[in-house]
Design a protein with these regions (language model features):
Chain B
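Surface-exposed, beta-sheet-biased, low-hydrophobicity segments with strongly acidic/polar composition
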Residues: 6-247
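C-terminal motif of bacterial Sec signal peptides marking the signal peptidase cleavage site
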Residues: 2-4
Length: 649, 247
């Protein structure tokens, strides 16, 4: 097969930006991930082993084995260097190898997500029931993705519907009355297909207890919630050269924090995409995406639903890929209209942003491949402009061995919230926006070595990031002598260094054993040039993390597949400097110790015939409970038994 | 297309539904969001306006209330350990509000008040003018008996001294330290709206039972908190139903 036709085939199979991926066979036994087509690193389809940008893939099989409900559950189980903690009001905050939620771009089929709380997207809306695989590219990628792609890109690739009509029901129960129910319907013919997914989850509030002697704020009640998530995706292929897709989704979450006035979160999404194969050498993609994320309060006794936040994003994208020989030229442009209404802002704000970019993927020979990209971004609010480059190199000195080097610039434009926030936080302080914030800019260098042969694979990857003008909440201050309430401003801090490396070994044996061991080291240093200390509400990355996975999959008969898996993660302890007195920063800081912890999960799955799968798991096998339930402590309260089943019709 | 640029399905929310400040006879709407003021209600004068049939004046009197500032300036001449600001530390982020320590006291002038008043509100706190209160199990004013005689033998609770409930000075709130006004409040009537902290942000527990207020002159009034937010969800906008009950 020529390279050109290979490219076209990959494009049609994966679609640029991963609109669809082909659903794998319904089996616990899966093929080699290296045949996986990935799109995130270059915005053009590449085989995983050949892509010049190191891409980590969480495969469909990994997702099935993890039995994760949402992205948070999955990442913290399988990814080293990832930790989730609580922000105020128990909103979930991500630390992704030293980068917070706003500096990691999370995409679904290449599209951005609207809405944020305390700098992070709503992870509960990222249900795993319709996900084919997840592609993760660490390091700055703003030359392809623009703002927010400072610390990396997580691209969730959803499933493509099977042509054959089928339905799937699943249910799972666990501790604290945690329940999950799912429904998937899909079907189609040679030219069209449709997939519908629905997930409903619920969990009760529960209390946790800290020992005496806590030196930082603790949590006493973990708030449950219930969610509904609906997604529909349709594909129509009027000809061999044209694919049209449409999608719509609705998400609802109600948090059980207050019986009288629970908080509600809703998301409405829709979009369309056209992939037109102009010739064997040319593929053009156009898409439109709508995403609206709302927050409201339900006043139960008054039966009033009052909305206090709405973020609406409309985006249009164009992407063109042209192949010549072994090389690919990629060019694209995006437009985004961003609307934010928030009763904690001084007014409603709107922003338009646009960008153009180009990339050349030059394959010198089978040993050397170079990718260079350049992008220009414009933001209408304060007329911010950025030019960002990126360079990636793959060298294959011998078969099965890849050495990759990359440099990328990343940036994050200040959000409308960070510019215009004006929120009296129940008298504690006024969180104050800063219209003069500068964009956060990062320089990322990475080097990796990957060796894959037969049943074994090894990857070692190192990186360093130098971030200037990092945007974060600053230290509290009084705006004037007469003000009695301090202000908590958004500021640019001088520097952030994030450096680290990861090492992963993976093996698969024909006896059905699959094992993976990953270690990550992260060193995160933030501060001002003059040594002024920061009152960051979030814990820096823990320096050492280890994740381990082993499973044994066996086909006992044509009617019986079984799998037993053990997953573990270890996170080292960390001391964090936190202010003694948030009103008197000059009093200095105290050291809050967050101890090391390890969590293990044992799970078993049994497929009986084509129609039934039973799932059992014991999470937190070692019955770990933190001594103090600080905001940054793991939210576990002992062993959690889970039982579920999946029925396929 | 233009509409979708700034959102869809606005209709599922109750934004801007109705007017906050239009109330019916026998109903109050008080902006009690201030941490620094008490608002006084004189039910006798409201009943006089009702009897006169002056709809405009009644509407005004039922929705416009004068703030009476809580004295916060230190006054050394004030009686020690009586009126003033009481500084307490609460274990907000630990064991809860029932764990506390007194950290200081600042004498201030007594709380000023008008010549005639029946009860007063400060956010979730309520005081009576020498009255006492009984909580019924009724949840509607219409369910109440026509005569107050059925309440005469009930146990009414008078106002009691408090120095940890009327939160005023929040300048050290993050350090779990609050400046509270030392003053008598009615704990029974104040239970119509309970401010729960933790969690952070706080939550409210709303009690829509009808309360019977017996004034110092022996009159009986039924009071019910009908709502505690405005149409945008801001708390401590109090809608209160009231009615005099003859003996």
């Amino acid at each position: 097969m020529s390279h050109t036709s290979l490219f076209t085939t990959l494009a049609l199979a994966a679609l640029p930006l991963g609109t669809f991926a082909v659903e794998p066979a319904d089996s616990l036994l899966t093929g080699n991930d290296l045949e996986q087509v990935v799109v995130t690193g270059t915005r053009s389809p590449k085989l995983l082993m050949e892509t010049p940008v190191l891409t980590q893939v969480i495969s469909h099989a990994d997702i099935e084995k993890a039995d994760a409900t949402n992205l948070k559950d999955l990442l913290q189980q399988v990814m080293p260097g990832v930790e989730f903690s609580f922000a105020q009001n128990q909103m979930v905050h991500l630390n992704f190898s030293g980068f917070g939620g706003q500096s990691v771009l999370i995409l679904v089929d290449g599209e951005r997500l609207a809405g944020e709380t305390m700098d992070d997207v709503d992870f509960t809306r990222l249900s795993m029931d319709n996900v084919d695989h997840i592609e993760i590219v660490k390091g700055a990628a703003s030359a392809l993705y623009g703002s927010n792609a400072n610390g990396g890109v997580i691209n969730i690739i959803t499933k493509q519907a099977a042509k054959k009509l089928n339905a799937c029901l699943d249910a799972r129960r666990a501790k604290h009355n945690e329940q999950r129910y799912g429904l998937a319907l899909q079907g189609g013919s040679s030219r069209w297909s449709n997939a519908f997914n629905m997930t409903h989850t619920t969990q009760d509030n529960y209390d946790v207890h800290s020992d005496d002697g806590a030196v930082a704020r603790t949590v006493t009640t973990i708030f449950g919630d219930h969610t509904w998530n609906f997604a529909d995706k349709a594909l129509w292929q009027p000809s061999d050269r044209l694919k049209l897709t449409g999608r719509a989704g609705y998400f609802f979450r109600q948090v059980k924090r207050s019986e009288e006035s629970p908080e509600r979160y809703r998301d409405f999404s829709a979009g369309g995409k056209a992939l037109w194969t102009l010739s064997d050498n040319d593929v053009l993609e156009g898409s439109y995406s709508f995403d609206q994320y709302d927050k409201s309060t339900w006043l139960k006794s008054q039966k009033i639903d009052t909305r206090n936040y709405s973020n609406v994003q409309n985006s249009v994208r164009l992407l063109y890929n042209h192949t010549f020989g072994d090389n690919v030229l990629t060019a694209g442009a995006d437009y985004l209209y961003d609307y934010l209404s928030n009763n904690k802002l001084d007014a409603v704000h709107r922003q338009q942003s646009a960008d153009v970019f180009a990339q050349l993927d030059w394959k010198l020979n089978r040993r050397w491949e170079f990718v260079g990209a350049l992008r220009y971004d414009y933001f209408s609010d304060h007329h911010i402009q950025r030019l960002t480059p990126k360079l990636s190199v793959r060298h294959t000195p011998v078969d099965h061995l890849n050495v990759r080097f990359g440099y990328g610039m990343g940036f994050r434009a200040p959000t409308l919230k960070e510019k215009y926030y004006d929120f009296d936080m129940i008298g504690i302080w006024t969180i104050t926006g800063n219209p003069l914030l500068k964009p956060e800019v990062s320089h990322n260098f990475n080097l990796s070595v990957e060796y894959v042969k037969g049943n074994y694979g090894f990857v070692v990857a190192g990186y360093c990031n130098r971030v200037t003008n990092k945007i974060t909440s600053g230290n509290p201050y009084y705006a004037s002598a007469t003000e009695t309430m301090p202000r908590l401003p958004y500021v640019n801090i001088d520097r952030l260094y994030v450096a680290g490396f990861e090492a992963t070994a993976r093996a698969r044996w024909s006896c059905g054993v699959d094992a993976r061991l990953s270690y990550a080291f992260v060193d995160e240093q933030a501060g001002h040039k003059d040594g002024q200390k920061l009152a960051s509400p979030y814990l820096p990355a823990r320096k050492h993390t280890l994740t381990a996975h082993a499973d044994w999959t066996h086909r006992f008969s044509t009617l019986l597949d079984g799998m037993v898996a053990l997953d573990g993660r270890f996170l080292s302890g960390i001391d964090n400097q936190e202010f003694k007195n948030y009103y008197k920063v000059e009093e200095g800081t105290i050291t809050v110790h967050y101890p090391a912890y390890t969590l293990w999960k044992l799970s078993a799955q049994m497929s009986i015939g084509k129609h039934l799968k039973l799932i059992f798991a014991v999470d937190n096998l070692l019955n770990y409970r933190p001594k103090y339930y600080y905001l940054n402590s793991p939210v576990v309260d002992g062993t959690n038994m889970m039982a579920g089943c999946k029925i396929r019709l | 297309m233009a509409a979708s640029c700034e959102g869809v399905f606005d209709g599922i929310y109750d934004e801007g539904a109705g007017s906050d400040t239009e109330v019916k006879a026998g109903q109050l709407y008080i902006d009690a969001t201030s941490w620094n003021d008490w608002y006084y209600v004189d039910l006798d004068s409201l009943l006089e306006l009702t009897d006169k049939g002056d709809v405009a004046a009644l509407q005004q009197a039922q929705t416009k209330f004068t703030p009476w500032p809580i004295p916060q300036t230190e006054n050394a001449d004030a009686a020690r350990d009586s009126s003033g600001m009481y500084i307490y530390w609460f274990d907000i982020f630990g064991k809860g509000m029932s764990y506390y320590e007194r950290r200081g006291y600042k004498p201030t002038a007594p709380q000023p008040e008008p010549e005639h008043w029946t009860f007063a509100v400060h956010r979730d706190n309520v005081r009576t003018n020498g009255g006492s209160v009984f909580e019924t199990s009724y949840t509607s004013m219409e369910e109440l008996p026509a005569s107050a005689s059925s309440f005469v033998d009930k146990t009414f609770t008078a106002d009691t001294w408090s120095e940890r409930d009327v939160w005023v000075d929040r300048t050290e709130m993050l350090n779990c330290i609050m400046g509270n006004q030392g003053i008598k409040i009615n704990q029974v009537l104040s239970s119509w709206l309970v401010f729960n902290i933790p969690p952070i942000p706080p939550t409210y527990t709303f009690n829509n039972h009808v309360f019977i207020l017996r004034t110092k002159d022996g009159e009986y009034f039924a009071l019910q908190l009908a709502n505690y937010t405005d149409s945008k969800g801001t708390t401590c906008y109090l809608t209160i139903n009231y009615r005099k009950i003859a003996l």
